[in-house]
């Protein structure tokens, strides 16, 4: 059985061979790596449908190279490509269906019945003092997300307190200016304001001659009145330890989110390169590509997240330490970014 390190080495070799195959295939590489919005897939062959790869884990604890395809039908025909059917440096290769992910920023509580055990109503209510894992939205706006956790600047325990969440929650996908007020819960009343937008990492989208990659969907907002919030706490999570931790395939995780409340799941893969995320609508998709992503599935066949849970900080369940920042999904798989990378971007640490 391969070790985690061996799986990482095999992943890099696999990616190199995949690029060579795609360049030499009859389907042009540009088409193979692009999302064809009208069809919901990149092409008509297994090679053309690969859009992401990472290192993951099977239920038996075996580390594997993960290959993600747009089209479920192509997963069935993947065995026709030797690269997908044979081990890479002794590490098995698993091919799975992963559709285009959707940025989870709208507050429609879909599948609420399935998530009722997570007490979602408590996470949508007004809370004072405000903990992590609750509803947040722009003052008088038309969407909501989740307040992930509170953070401070590195080494400054007496400095300003910030909210950590997603760009598409706090900055409305690069649109909001600094100083935009946010309320808890979503409200049209300025009296419910708890923070104002401070900074965000821009989300990059394709343009003629440019195919940029993203690694985080993250932003911070400065807390307006620290007396109105409580640090070191996630609503309905018993163990929260505000110390960053590296994610790992097979890790049991938990999160508190605005729509599904507290849910539990498992990290299926990390260092996933090439995940396609839709920041538009189904009819008018606006696709951004993410590298170094993390994929998670919920326990017991339940969704780990739903729209409105974006911005949730995902914790290692055993230690309560933050490992990821939730930002997208498809109803079955949740996609997150490494929260350590997000914190480093803003020079902050959880508190």
Question: What feature does the model see in each segment?
Answer:
Residues 2, 6-162, 175-210:
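Protease-domain processing segments flanking chymotrypsin-fold serine proteases, especially trypsin-like
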Residues 115-293, 297-298, 307, 315-321, ...:
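Serine endopeptidase catalytic core focused on the charge-relay Asp
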Residues 147, 336-351:
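C-terminal, disordered and strongly charge-biased linear tails with low hydrophobicity
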Residues 325-326, 350:
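Peptidoglycan cell-wall recognition and remodeling modules
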Residues 330-331:
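A short acidic/small-residue loop/turn micro-motif
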Residues 75-88, 232-244, 337-344:
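Surface-exposed flexible segments
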């Amino acid at each position: 059985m391969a070790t985690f390190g061996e799986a990482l080495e095999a992943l890099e070799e696999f990616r190199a061979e995949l690029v060579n195959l795609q360049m030499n295939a009859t389907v042009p590489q540009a088409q193979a790596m692009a999302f064809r919005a009208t069809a919901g897939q990149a092409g008509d062959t297994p090679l053309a449908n690969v859009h992401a790869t990472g290192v993951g884990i099977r239920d038996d604890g075996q580390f594997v190279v993960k290959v993600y395809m747009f089209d479920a039908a192509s997963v069935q025909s993947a065995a026709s490509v030797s690269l997908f059917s044979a081990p890479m440096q002794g590490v098995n290769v698993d091919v799975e269906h992963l559709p285009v992910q959707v940025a989870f920023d709208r507050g429609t509580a879909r599948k609420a019945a399935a998530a009722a055990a997570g007490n979602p109503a408590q996470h949508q209510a007004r809370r004072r003092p405000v903990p992590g894992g609750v509803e947040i939205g722009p003052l008088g706006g038309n969407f909501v997300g989740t307040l992930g956790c509170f953070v401070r600047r590195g080494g400054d325990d007496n400095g300003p307190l910030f909210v950590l969440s997603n760009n598409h929650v706090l900055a409305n996908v690069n649109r909001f200016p600094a100083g935009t007020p946010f309320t808890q819960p979503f409200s049209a009343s300025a009296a419910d304001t708890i923070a104002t937008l401070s900074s965000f990492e821009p989300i990059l989208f394709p343009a003629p001659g440019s195919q940029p990659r993203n690694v985080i969907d993250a932003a911070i907002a400065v807390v307006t009145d620290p007396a109105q919030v409580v640090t070191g706490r996630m609503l309905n999570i018993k163990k929260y330890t505000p110390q960053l931790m590296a994610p790992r395939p097979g890790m049991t995780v938990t999160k508190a989110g605005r729509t599904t409340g507290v849910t539990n799941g498992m990290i299926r893969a990390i260092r996933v390169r090439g995940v396609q995320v839709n920041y538009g609508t189904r009819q008018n998709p606006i696709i951004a590509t993410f590298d170094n992503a993390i994929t998670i599935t919920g326990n017991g066949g339940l969704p780990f997240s739903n729209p409105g849970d974006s911005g949730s900080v995902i914790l290692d369940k055993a230690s309560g330490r933050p490992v990821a920042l939730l930002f997208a999904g498809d109803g079955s798989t949740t996609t997150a970014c490494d929260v350590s990378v997000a914190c480093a971007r803003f020079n902050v640490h959880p508190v």
